[in-house]
Amino acid sequence: MSEIDAQKVAQRIDTVLDILVAGDYHSAIRNLEILKSELLDHTNAGNTADSAQPKAPWEV
């Protein structure tokens, strides 16, 4: 498994912040969802879905 490049993650977070400042909240949220998905895929490459935390009621 490769290491997570913190610099690239920070750059992507900066991009999301720029999108938020521009007022495009939908795109910012979508970019955060993509980043989250990629990070989880990276860290859970060998894990099963059974170990996932249950979702809070507002996330269901």
UniProtKB/Swiss-Prot annotation:
First and last residue of the signal peptide: none
Superkingdom of source: Bacteria
InterPro entries in the record: UPF0509 (IPR020887)
Pfam family, one: YciZ
Family: Belongs to the UPF0509 family.
Database matches in NCBIfam families: PRK13658.1
Name assigned to this protein: UPF0509 protein Ent638_2183
